[in-house]
Amino acid sequence: MSKKFIITWDAMQTYCRELAEKQMPAEQWKGIWAVSRGGLVPGAILARELGIRYVDTICISSYDHDHQRDMTVLKAPEGDGEGYLIVEDLVDSGDTARKLREMYPKAKMIAVCAKPSGKELLDDYVVDIAQDTWIEQPWDMSIQYAEPVNRKQK
């Protein structure tokens, strides 16, 4: 993927607050199930914004940094998902979301970002991303010193 969409910490906070507003009233939710690892930060922000104290994880492995591979369920809460928000940072191909729908047919599945191949599997999301674009999440980046241009030429 040659295109990149960079999400800053500030933008992630803003997107998650917008996503939280769509989940009101908060009292309808028993808890949040954050999909590890991408959904952990959005899940924490949503828990704060909605005043939800019960947060658990669904651990599914399907990526090695930028390469998708076979899916493995490492940890999964019991039940059909009724009353729970399943939170992801991104729905890309839809493979993980499809698996989650099978496992938890009554949960509400939400994500911060969605690509065309997977967005129909979501109940809510806030940012549309082109299918050929790689997302750089704030937890995958660091701020570094950049040499001034005039010093690079010497």
Curated annotation (Swiss-Prot):
Which GO terms fall under molecular function for this chain's record?
Answer: guanine phosphoribosyltransferase activity; hypoxanthine phosphoribosyltransferase activity; magnesium ion binding; xanthine phosphoribosyltransferase activity
Give residues annotated as binding guanine.
Answer: 92, 135
- Compartments it resides in: Cell inner membrane
Topology in the lipid bilayer is annotated as: Peripheral membrane protein
Taxonomy, superkingdom: Bacteria
Cofactors per UniProt? Mg(2+)
Which Enzyme Commission numbers does its entry carry?
2.4.2.-, 2.4.2.22
The protein's annotated pathway: Purine metabolism; GMP biosynthesis via salvage pathway; GMP from guanine: step 1/1; Purine metabolism; XMP biosynthesis via salvage pathway; XMP from xanthine: step 1/1
- Coiled-coil residues are none
Q: Which GO terms describe its cellular component?
A: cytosol; plasma membrane
Indicate the family of this protein: Belongs to the purine/pyrimidine phosphoribosyltransferase family. XGPT subfamily.
Q: Quaternary state and partners of this protein?
A: Homotetramer.
Q: Which NCBIfam families does UniProt cross-reference here?
A: PRK09177.1, tet_prtrans_34
Q: What is this protein called?
A: Xanthine-guanine phosphoribosyltransferase
Species of the source: Vibrio parahaemolyticus serotype O3:K6 (strain RIMD 2210633)
